[in-house]
Amino acid sequence: MSGMHAQGDLPIPNITHIEQPYHWDHALPGESRDDFGIRAAGWLEEKILAIGPEKVAAFIGEPVQGAGGVIIPPETYWPEIQRIVDKYGILLISDEVICAFGRLGHWFAYEKFGYKPDLVTFAKGVTSGYIPLGGVMVGNRVADVLIEKGGEFNHGYTYSGHPVACAVALANLNLMEKEDLPRRVREDTGPYLAQKFEALKAHALVGDAQTCGFVGGLVLIKNKSTRAMFDSELGVGMRCRAHCFKNGLIMRAVGDRMIISPPLIMTRAQIDEMMVLINRCLDATLSDLQEAGHCA
């Protein structure tokens, strides 16, 4: 996220971060995903103790990091995060602007990973992106305090409760429920996409490829055996993105990670079509790099 942080006056005082739970990049030799998930969650406890538990109000995180490159945590990560925040009486905020409303095969991503947040932020998928709308869901732990201690909560936005946006959201959610899209992603098209993405690991340019529901990401790598990365100045991700656009494929470049977030209504046949284009663009990118002498 450093590229985005550089565009604003960040870091913000009194907000600190921990490392992302990315097994491929941060695991110790021979460390399983489950063991790594526990260790990665432990970074939060280390940070809490370094700051002082009495000074930490909340931990906020995306169930699956989206704009940071589609970083999919091990199954053990979020339950351990839950244990840690409960231990120190810290609020847990689930940032589900990307992950909610079927994206991971559930209405909300915290259902998939088995934790209970105190607050949930959402946007994007609530209207399927047809019109802007966002919101915050507040759990009893927070709501009860607001009711008992604060009376009215005088906070809002200029466009809160916009009738057109809310009407679109209701129509969208009714359609998603009618077509049972979260279940379809969870039981059918999501596993099919995962199978196809797994096959991308055989490509000479791909170091890792993963999906979770209907988000996916792959990392472009210079040498598979040594895991050597390309020089960032080469802009390999942007080169790949250019080939994607030329071939009618939308993939986002996050450094040298290529990520997708396809429509929830995508069929298996359309997934096959997308995978053909992804492989074609990877081949074209590899050819460019080989011709320029940047890889074997």
Language-model region placement:
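Conserved N-terminal phosphate-binding loop of PLP-dependent enzymes in the Aspartate aminotransferase
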Residues: 1-296
